[in-house]
């Protein structure tokens, strides 16, 4: 670290990492001594998570993590996967929706579903949330949500660039309050992560595809 002061993002990352190690250990070990140590690590992680601003109190968070412990391979804790779709049309416009939960605008996105490929999830999310049919063209980005600070849940975000192929605008009644096509000079507000993804998105819409964005390894890769 470059400062003696620990940031909330660092505390959150360390907490989630410790919790993942401890829950994975509990999922694989039946040795009582080891299990007790893993549970103690979970207590430390819950203290850190609460200090980072979690809504639950220490005991509730620890209990929630304990209830999520699986056995064997299903118990190996990994980041969740979110799949998004930046969709462009022939008029150079970008498909955006206003999220029902926050009122913010963003491209269609959702959790990866079992039984679907990542590209299929992108097509499915676009259809369900906006009524538009699309075809995936390329992967724009694969990034760590915690590292970029746009989530408090450990996740990898995979964002596809897609071209609209049909359908008509229709907002999902539970997930979106509005949907629409927008040019770069007429974007709605508030828009999530404007500077982070919008320039790359419109470059793709206009045909200037770039290499997939990803988080370069830190040096050292871990831990601080």
What are these regions (language model features)?
Residues 35, 39-84:
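Acidic, metal-coordinating catalytic segment for phosphate/diphosphate chemistry
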Residues 55-60, 116, 209-210:
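Juxtamembrane/interface motifs at transmembrane-helix termini
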Residues 2-38, 44, 104, 174-224:
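Nudix hydrolase/Nudix homology domain
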Residues 65-107, 134, 138:
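N-terminal strand-loop-strand
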Residues 112-136, 143-201, 221-224:
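Unchanged
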Residues 24-28, 72, 143-146:
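Alpha-helix C-capping/helix-to-loop hinge sites
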């Amino acid at each position: 670290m470059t400062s003696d002061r620990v940031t909330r993002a660092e505390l959150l990352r360390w907490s989630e990492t410790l919790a993942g190690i401890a829950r994975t250990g509990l999922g694989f070990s039946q040795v009582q001594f080891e299990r007790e140590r893993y549970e103690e690590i979970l207590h430390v992680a819950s203290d850190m998570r609460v200090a980072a601003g979690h809504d639950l109190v220490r005991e509730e968070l620890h209990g929630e993590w304990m209830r999520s412990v699986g056995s064997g391979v299903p118990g190996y804790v990994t980041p969740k996967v979110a799949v998004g779709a930046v969709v462009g049309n022939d008029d150079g416009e970008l498909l955006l929706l206003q999220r029902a939960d926050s009122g913010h605008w963003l491209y269609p996105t959702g959790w990866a579903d079992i039984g679907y490929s990542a590209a299929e999830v992108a097509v499915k999310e676009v259809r369900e949330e906006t009524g538009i049919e699309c075809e995936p063209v390329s992967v724009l980005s694969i990034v760590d949500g915690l590292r970029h600070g746009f989530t408090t849940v450990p996740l990898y975000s995979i964002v596809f660039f897609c071209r609209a192929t049909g359908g008509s605008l229709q907002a999902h009644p539970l997930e979106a309050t509005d949907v629409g096509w927008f040019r770069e000079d007429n974007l709605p507000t508030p828009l999530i992560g404007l500077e982070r993804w919008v320039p790359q998105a419109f470059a793709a819409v206009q045909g200037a595809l770039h290499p997939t964005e990803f988080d370069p390894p830190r040096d050292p890769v871990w831990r601080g």
